Amino acid sequence: MSAKDVKFGVDARDKMLRGVDILANAVKVTLGPKGRNVVLEKSFGAPRITKDGVTVAKEIELEDKFENMGAQMVREVASKSADAAGDGTTTATVLAQAIVREGAKSVAAGMNPMDLKRGIDLAVEAVVADLVRNSKKVTSNDEIAQVGTISANGDSEIGKFLANAMKRVGNEGVITVEEAKSLETELDVVEGMQFDRGYISPYFVTNADKMRVEMDDAYILINEKKLSSLNELLPLLEAVVQTGKPLVIVAEDVEGEALATLVVNRLRGGLKVAAVKAPGFGDRRKAMLQDIAILTGGQAISEDLGIKLENVTLAMLGKAKKVMIDKENTTIVNGAGKKADIEARVAQIKAQIEETTSDYDREKLQERLAKLAGGVAVIRVGGATEVEVKERKDRVDDAMHATRAAVEEGIVPGGGVALLRASEQLKRIKTANDDQKTGVEIVRKALSAPARQIAINAGEDGSVIVGKILEKEQYSYGFDSQSGEYGNLISKGIIDPTKVVRAAIQNAASVAALLITTEAMVAELPKKNAGGPAMPAGGGMGGMDF
């Protein structure tokens, strides 16, 4: 085990505070509509330009081990806020820095760190309660667009795209962000359920121009196993032919005699049919087939359930108004499933999302949820250069998470005003002793830091702006740093999702309180290089000097 360097008390806190300041100072320049860019060097390719706090925080690694520990703790604040609400990372970092700074001064003055922490916790509870009390539900499309615009640093085009996407796929739908190959930003929405499996044979194609299968009012057979023998399929095919409706077969695979017969019947025009492979693998495939069955009002044919293919009736098949199959994807629109069954399945998947600890499983469950509950929207972000596209994509990602959070928990005035107003409530908190009172006071001072920083980034005097905002009693009154005017921020469309502001203060206070109560730090000593003998000068072979 290698030797360790240990620092105590003031020494430890000073080093840690230096690390906190380096990271926070780099992150906080991005705050607000007039926040600056940060350029990140990449080991290959062009440098990356971003205004996303967590992206900047993740790039910072300091040489001094003790300073680095402080920086990494604050990086955790940004990461936790990004995970919880998807935005508000810079606000959280600014708050954490302010709490740690004031807290370190109080500890140096001889106050009890544990009582300071209790005071901080009391203050955060009061702030969260105030935010929830003043939160306003998001109802209109315009409000969603405003949230997106603010989070995308004042880019109204992004706000409109997101509002449109949310309107089309609903709150449960999935919105993904990709890089476009063109200059324009586009929105592509897939309504209904889509999975990434195409037709098994191109002979099933009905629309030769677009090379895809299009079927209206189709029956859907959902079979878990492979289909190779025709005999077990024959009774069902005859029943479907009698109805004159098309049939889509979803199975593990269709091959041999079964595939040949289906293709021949399709080409002769006797039976409108198409076959696709089932999506997913293993247990996930079973779950996805069950999703398709519930969406279409059919039954997944599985030997586990004791159902054999030859005994399947028309009543066991799913139905959909439209099915489209191309080379790579299958889309089922307007399945005939009962609303109550679909809602029950959605609730079940939501419960699984809450329980799972794996990020991969959570992502897959959310995809399944979207396919059942809404749809999938893809925003393709365009730009003139790769650097511009990447920077814009970061902002769209932030804005997307912010709009989701706004729909979930509502909105409060932006520009750091909600936290400023909450700071006024902290004067009423009763504490057990003076040290706890100082803990509350630390948070009260810190709550003005985001509004102050937004003003500083806009070239204004932060203290003057904060003073003017607090002079007015009106909750939504604040400073619009984009236009340089004061007024009602909610009516100006300057709003923050309550969830984002709440997560920012909770995460900032949690990590800052830990830093304040730190009394010792342990880090590995830097290894001394045991260098070998130096190379001879010139690097030539012996006896070849000129």
UniProtKB/Swiss-Prot annotation:
SUPFAM superfamilies: GroEL apical domain-like (SSF52029), GroEL equatorial domain-like (SSF48592), GroEL-intermediate domain like (SSF54849). It comes from the Bacteria. Keywords: ATP-binding, Chaperone, Cytoplasm, Isomerase, Nucleotide-binding. GO terms for cellular component: cytoplasm. The keyword Cytoplasm applies. Disulfide bonds: none annotated. InterPro entries: Chaperonin_Cpn60_CS, Cpn60/GroEL, Cpn60/GroEL/TCP-1, GroEL-like_apical_dom_sf, GROEL-like_equatorial_sf, TCP-1-like_intermed_sf. PROSITE patterns: CHAPERONINS_CPN60. It is found in: Cytoplasm. It catalyses: ATP + H2O + a folded polypeptide = ADP + phosphate + an unfolded polypeptide. The keyword Methyltransferase does not apply. Its EC number is 5.6.1.7. Its main location: cytoplasm. GO terms for molecular function: ATP binding; ATP-dependent protein folding chaperone; isomerase activity; unfolded protein binding. GO terms for biological process: protein refolding. ATP binds at residues 30-33, 51, 87-91, 415, 496. HAMAP family: CH60. NCBIfam families: GroEL, PRK00013.1, PRK12849.1, PRK12850.1, PRK12851.1, PRK14104.1. Belongs to the chaperonin (HSP60) family. Forms a cylinder of 14 subunits composed of two heptameric rings stacked back-to-back. Interacts with the co-chaperonin GroES. Together with its co-chaperonin GroES, plays an essential role in assisting protein folding. The GroEL-GroES system forms a nano-cage that allows encapsulation of the non-native substrate proteins and provides a physical environment optimized to promote and accelerate protein folding. This is Chaperonin GroEL 2. It comes from Nitrobacter hamburgensis (strain DSM 10229 / NCIMB 13809 / X14). The lineage of its organism: Bacteria, Pseudomonadati, Pseudomonadota, Alphaproteobacteria, Hyphomicrobiales.
